[in-house]
Amino acid sequence: WGVGRRLSEHLNKAKITNALQLADIDPQYIKRKFSVVLERTVRELRGQRCLNIEESISAKKQIVVSRSFGTRVTDLKTLKPIVSNFAVRASEKLRNEKQKCSQVSVFVRTSPFSDHMPQHRGYKTIELFTPTNDTRDILIAAKKALLPIFRSGYDYAKAGILLSRFSNETSRQFSLFKDPNEPKENSEFMKYIDQLNNYETQIYFASQNTKRWSPMKQNMTSPKYTTDWYELPKAN
């Protein structure tokens, strides 16, 4: 309950040696003599809820979607749809958190274990003029971040996308500098897309690979007992 050794010594001097005795003490006395935190502990021991659910769950600071590749990726044509898949998935997570982001970062790297191969790490962050959770905005930013960090001649082993600098999705912030050619944010449209894709992905953006995580490393995945007829468990 957050009662450490030093605090225990002070409680023992007050003849409080167990949780039952602590629960019987007047919370106001505990607040005066010790702290608000310990007073809250006393109230919780009495069965009183002191924190709302919203206070207990801290909001995420960032969302990361990344994968290691089962086969090395050497060309931008293959890498683009992979990063697009990451951007779409990260956008879905962002909307589930009821947040918007102001930064989109993309990273790529070769395998640090392949000492005999040329090594390269690339990382780029795009600042958004206005916070968004619209997949289309995040896809555009991801593409802008990927192009300058890609280098031909390297065997890439991993890539990923990171969304950060969050704000509540109900907040509104406008900018005079937003590119008019960028798609307008439409929360209802994205909500509709999420509903359609709730169980199995049915709608893809043009920049995506329809095999969502290909060519990812999937040799250690668990059998799909509930979604694939060919992987149903067999009873002898």
Question: Model-flagged regions — what are they?
Answer:
Residues N12-G153, S171:
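DNA-contacting surface of Y-family translesion DNA polymerases
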